[in-house]
Amino acid sequence: MEKVKLQAQYGLYINGEWRNASDGATYNAESPADGSHLAVCAQGSREDVEAASAAAWEAFKTWKKTTPAQRAALLNKIADIIDANKEHLAMVESMDNGKPIRETMNVDIPMAAEHFRYFAGCILAEEGQASVLNEQFLSIILREPIGVVGQIIPWNFPFLMAAWKLAPVLAAGDCTVLKPSKEASLSILEFARLIDGVLPAGVFNVITGAGSKTGQYMLEHKNFAKLAFTGSTEVGRNVGLAAAERIIPATLELGGKSANIYFDDCDFDQAIDGAQLGILFNQGQVCCAGSRIFVQDTIYDKFVPALVKAFNKVKVGLPWNDDTQMGSQINETQIKKILSYVEIAKQEGATIACGGERFTEGELAKGAFMKPTLITGVTNDMRVAQEEIFGPVAVVIKFHDEDEVVAVANDSEYGLGGAVWTKDINKAIRVARNVETGRMWVNTYNQIPEHSPFGGYKTSGIGRETHKMILNHYTQVKNIMINLSYAPSGFYPQD
């Protein structure tokens, strides 16, 4: 596909208007694939965050009174706009983020549209609750919008993660100030341009800028009714602390070191494909990536060479090329972090079975392209098995039986994703239930559709997204207790 032409400069989207940062600050957006300049973006200030919040609270006065049918119609309209501009948005995402166009065309953009449609359906199907407690009292339970939410989006799935946050917040009747990552803001800015005028002014606001500046202003802002964050556990902890200090809720989708478990009765070809899908999809920059591959000892000697061969055949290339299977890491900082873990693995006594280095020649030399990497001779106590690398790097750990692999899989501070590969459905269900994680796949990996709750155990987060239950996080409960009797309570004497 051909690259698209972007605006030379993007402002902040506040109260339905585009404006420069209050202090005029900007930053350059560059493609991680070739270092080319893409656009100039506004660096949001503290005053800009306050202005966006004020606009959102003003809009909330009327937005909260809209009916589910009205909001559902707008959500469906947004989904239609996304579909109509799929090729454009997909290419913007690939240019800005470095992920292959085949992923943005088939996963990121279409799934984002489906999230808006899903939550439109959820609110139309919601019927509320009323209970007759006894002959005297009727209890009505309502869920009301919580207010203005501060939402912070990561760089690994900028457009899709924005949909995960934006669709339910709008469905619930809330307003939002959304901050995409500085590393990949352009698809969200283009989205704001495309839906300009669809939502009432102030309902949806976009503030761009560095996490250390604009992101910190979001955390320090006093007027959000809730915070929602996807990103690292380290930053997520700060988000949780900021919310706790103000006694507001926070939804946190954080890091992972997920176990991808292969028993000897798995379908072998499917298993090899699944190991690649688990760690090479999106260049391994996936919070639930299958970065710990557990292989039963009876097939280990067959499995590892086959996986090495498969890894070495992966087509790494420029993200806008149709035949590219794996694109660029997000930036130079990230690829240096990945390479540092390769060195740590060597120091710990592990073996680099394939990859372990970046591309330094040809058309990929100017970008942050990593070779698919497999590390063997690993024990679960090594740093490369415990710490999130966030790249196309998997460790392979041998196990003997079911009890052993469950125990070792659970020996992690994280609990976000995981998978089990076997033809024995009873074994699959046992392992899926016993591994301490929020999402377990069986004979597949990295499927993240709407209507299936996604979120973590342990330090992998708080709350569940991509399911109607997230609406509970964006609303608050009101109980109306009605006395059906005209008689006094009898607690106090009457004349």
Protein language model regions, located:
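Residue-level signal for inorganic ion chemistry
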Residues: 35, 71, 93, 116, ...
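Rossmann-like NAD(P) dinucleotide-binding subdomain of oxidoreductase/dehydrogenase enzymes
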Residues: 128-270, 399
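Short, well-ordered beta-strand elements within core beta-sheets of diverse protein domains
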Residues: 37-44, 59-65, 151, 260-263, ...
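Structural signal for hydrophobic packing residues in well-ordered secondary-structure cores
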Residues: 60, 64, 79-86, 90, ...
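Glycine-rich loop-to-alpha-helix module at the N-terminal edge of alpha/beta enzyme cores
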Residues: 36-126, 136
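ALDH superfamily catalytic-core signature
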Residues: 234-379, 442, 489-494
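Conserved C-terminal structural/oligomerization subdomain of aldehyde/semialdehyde dehydrogenase
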Residues: 36-39, 261, 315, 365-495
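Hydrophobic face of amphipathic alpha-helices that form TPR/SEL1-like repeat modules
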Residues: 1-33, 357
